Amino acid sequence: MDRRNDYGYRVPLFQGPLPPPGSLGLPFPPDIQTETTEEDSVLLMHTLLAATKDSLAMDPPVVNRPKKSKTKKAPIKTITKAAPAAPPVPAANEIATNKPKITWQALNLPVITQISQALPTTEVTNTQASSVTAQPKKANKMKRVTAKAAQGSQSPTGHEGGTIQLKSPLQVLKLPVISQNIHAPIANESASSQALITSIKPKKASKAKKAANKAIASATEVSLAATATHTATTQGQITNETASIHTTAASIRTKKASKARKTIAKVINTDTEHIEALNVTDAATRQIEASVVAIRPKKSKGKKAASRGPNSVSEISEAPLATQIVTNQALAATLRVKRGSRARKAATKARATESQTPNADQGAQAKIASAQTNVSALETQVAAAVQALADDYLAQLSLEPTTRTRGKRNRKSKHLNGDERSGSNYRRIPWGRRPAPPRDVAILQERANKLVKYLLVKDQTKIPIKRSDMLRDVIQEYDEYFPEIIERASYTLEKMFRVNLKEIDKQSSLYILISTQESSAGILGTTKDTPKLGLLMVILSVIFMNGNKASEAVIWEVLRKLGLRPGVRHSLFGEVRKLITDEFVKQKYLEYKRVPNSRPPEYEFFWGLRSYHETSKMKVLKFACRVQKKDPKDWAVQYREAVEMEVQAAAVAVAEAEARAEARAQMGIGEEAVAGPWNWDDMDIDCLTREELGDDAQAWSRFSFEIEARAQENADASTNVNFSRGASTRAGFSDGASISFNGAPSSSGGFSGGPGITFGVAPSTSASFSNTASISFGGTLSTSSSFSSAASISFGCAHSTSTSFSSEASISFGGMPCTSASFSGGVSSSFSGPLSTSATFSGGASSGFGGTLSTTAGFSGVLSTSTSFGSAPTTSTVFSSALSTSTGFGGILSTSVCFGGSPSSSGSFGGTLSTSICFGGSPCTSTGFGGTLSTSVSFGGSSSTSANFGGTLSTSICFDGSPSTGAGFGGALNTSASFGSVLNTSTGFGGAMSTSADFGGTLSTSVCFGGSPGTSVSFGSALNTNAGYGGAVSTNTDFGGTLSTSVCFGGSPSTSAGFGGALNTNASFGCAVSTSASFSGAVSTSACFSGAPITNPGFGGAFSTSAGFGGALSTAADFGGTPSNSIGFGAAPSTSVSFGGAHGTSLCFGGAPSTSLCFGSASNTNLCFGGPPSTSACFSGATSPSFCDGPSTSTGFSFGNGLSTNAGFGGGLNTSAGFGGGLGTSAGFSGGLSTSSGFDGGLGTSAGFGGGPGTSTGFGGGLGTSAGFSGGLGTSAGFGGGLVTSDGFGGGLGTNASFGSTLGTSAGFSGGLSTSDGFGSRPNASFDRGLSTIIGFGSGSNTSTGFTGEPSTSTGFSSGPSSIVGFSGGPSTGVGFCSGPSTSGFSGGPSTGAGFGGGPNTGAGFGGGPSTSAGFGSGAASLGACGFSYG
């Protein structure tokens, strides 16, 4: 029979009106205590009885009638029939008041035992039979009879009950012994019939009396309590009117004793009838009349007639809750009769007739009238006495509590509110109910703490914890506050132990603990459980992939493939069958069910409730996909189901979180829930069952508690952490310090000695980090923040008023309007803030990286006055802002440079006099990369006036701009050059006389890159005559040919250059004397970018000697080659630099003495960005760089490398800094005496000094995805401009890095809409302008490139909306000056992409290998495959 209530049993639905509050055990309000009135009791009884009326008639017991037997032993059997329910009756006190009372003295009874018992949940109809045996000749036979009677009449349960015995002599009736059982008063329980046994004394009366007493004592009936109402009633209170059951046993004495042994004394229990009584007196009447006539026969063998009676005395009929119980008691008379079969048959027939109808047949009764007449007076007196005693005792029981006794096997605990509990289920007893204890938060928290320890102990076995166990073992009388106690415990578990309490079965109230730290498989458990949970994941995946169920045969087929077989013990899993069918089932990981109607029985496995909470179908699907090396979408049905479950689970999680937060707020649950000491000594293991403990005697040794208890609140040097979502006034962490994680306004916060750290997007007033220092992450309105003694740092604040970093220094990352920021002693730095009023970088200086409106010194600010990277007299620079005045990368006089900004005045990269350069800006005036006089250059801008890359007089050059006037890359006289435009007049890259050059045009006449007589050059076009790149005598150059003789980029004597060829002799980019250069060739000798004496650079070659980008003395540079010596970007003595090479010596960007720089190599000496004496720098090498003025020792950028020493970003005395190295020692971002700091070591994803609403920027090395210095609206930027995605100085495995752009998604030193570029070694880098996607000087396997010897996707000096262009040595997918297999570009391998076309080119490759498509034409022309390939 299905029977579950809140604790595992079902309650029938109520048919009547709802009961009053509190009558069904529902919690009272804490400040209200109610009492149940008489009307409430009547109403409740009516409701319960009406609800269970039908259920009473459902399970009639089976009537077993004995067959006639000729044996000497005849059993005494009972026939029990359930009585239907009756209408309600008035309350107990009315019954007791209206009934005439009989005093104990008037009754004068000898002994009357009254037993009051209550049992939970179910009502039992206990049919008891008392056998009165006449005295036999042998006394030992009597013991056997009474023992059997006791066995048949025992109660089915062994729970305790309160017993009150009232004794009084029954002198008036003068009865020998009367045993009366008065059962527990229950509001809707019927009166129990009393067993009345009369023994007529035979010969040995004393023994017969003892036997009868034993039989009576063993025939005790237990009635079950039904509900928990507050009204006290007694046995005599009757909710349903029942008819009295008259059972008479007539014995006829006969002289024939031979057949007396076959006499059968049958006890017949008939159905009760309902009699509606209008008054309380009739409603309380319960009479049991019994008459026993014992006629002694002459022979003693009749004693065997009752020997088998006790075996079937008691039949138990269970009825649901709130049913009427009528216990019929049988009177067994053992008769000694003489022989005479007629008398026996008459008596049997009379009894059978009487059991069928309440009105017995008069004819049958007449035959035994003489026997009834003899006992009629006795029956009347006994009935009156019993009723009087019940009525009198009724009032007493309503005032007296029950006593508690302890049973050995099953213990029952009774609570203050009248609850009586046994096992895992209990119910409330209305007459014993008391009001719930008052709500005391301290006591509730104490119970919650105990519950936490209780749950942690119980969860060790992973068997779900029952709510009833928690109520019984921990919460006890505070069960009214169970929701609040368990919520407090759940909060403590989350905050202290990082586990969540989940109710997996609301019907059975089962709870589990789930850790917030998942394993890779998604299933959670300790280390010792890992093998089992791995096996569980296999089983779950099989079930899920087979339609959410799997037969046992399928499971074993899979397990056999893993070497697991039933019956074979495994070293890790033990008995596998027991593990998957018993342990996992108990832990609710699996369900193991029999297939319906299967013959022989078959079983199936399903997911258990715990599995749905500890993992998900998506995780299991991915697990299966990893095993089979497939994509989850290959299983469309399972994938769709997993996605739906994920969405549903997410919605449920959000709803539960909101509901829990609201509930906790209403209950006032907060940080106090985790306060207070924790003592595990008061926790025993009695709460564990034998099943959970197992056979281990030392149970505690099986449990390991990994507890991360937090420091106590309000202790010395305590921490104050605020995780609230509401407004927070102040939060302190560690000695007054505070840390605040909130999305609402935060006034103040401190971290470590008054400092504070604030994480949030709402207005943040003040935050301090480390001794009144502060750091603010993402606050919308950040007023003030300090970092390291009045210093502050602000990340992404919209409105940042003042920030300081390191002694009133400040740094602002992406704040829109930044009023003042100081970085290192009054200095300030603003990274891409649109409105930056004043920013200083290193001692009063101001620097803005990407700010739109920067008053003083802005790297990409609109109005930037001056910025110096160590050069002597420079005016201003702006990296990708609108208005820029001047900038100098070590040049003597440089006016302005604009990396993608609209109006740019002048810029000099180490040249003497340079006017302006614009990388992608519209109007660009002049720029000089180390040349003497340079007017303007525009990389992709509309109008460009002049540009000089180291040449003496350069007029203009336009990379993809429509009108291009002239450009000189170090040559004396340059007129014009167009990279990809339709009409190109003349271009001189430093040559004296240069007529024309067309990069991709159909007809190209002449081009001279600085060479004196330069006739023509064609980059991939059909007709190509000559090209001189600034050399006096330039013979020939071929971009993509196998053998290239000479090319001069501005140098006087230039011998040969091969862009992608195997052997190169010489190339000069504006240098006076240039020996050789190889752009990805194997062996290159020298290259000079407008520097005076330069030996050799190799852009991707294996061996390179020297390169000078405008520097006076430059020794060697290698962009991707293994050994490189020196490079100087405008500096006087520059020794060596290597972009990805193994050994690099020196690099100087405008500084005086520079020793070495290595971008990604193992060993490198020095890098100087404008500082006078700079020792070493390495961008992922073992040593370190220095970016500073003054005596900066060393710096290590170590992007992905192990050991970086130090770095200094600023003047003064900087000691060291490590930016992302594995073992980076220190970093100092300021002047004065700053010692060390480390920014993003090891595996940093992104960090930087980047711009506006930038997503990720920084100097991040290792496995950093993006790094940079800039960006206005870029997601991540280097030193760059507007909409830069990701760029910077990233080495190692960085994705992209660059120095700025205007609207580029990622850019190097350029503007436009470039995607990714920069100076980084390994993946990508770029140096360029316009609307190119990916370009740069990078080495390694680039997706967007530079001068590399490894596969690169795209780079180059291209203009217009070209996709991918670059100088790459390896396989390039885009277009560029590279060798090796490239899909499009200037490479030696296969090239498939587009070239330098002015129109919509399909693809072109200036490579030495096979080129699938070339389009160096204007318009929509596509020349098809290019023939300049050798691979």
Curated annotation (Swiss-Prot):
Renumbered residue ranges of the record's region 62 X 10 AA approximate tandem repeats: 751-1430
Keyword Repeat on entry: yes
Recorded GO CC terms: nucleus; plasma membrane
Biological process according to GO: embryo implantation; homophilic cell adhesion via plasma membrane adhesion molecules; negative regulation of transcription by RNA polymerase II
Biased composition (Basic residues): 405-415
Assembly description: Directly binds bystin, and indirectly tastin.
Name of the protein in question: Trophinin
Organism: Homo sapiens (Human)
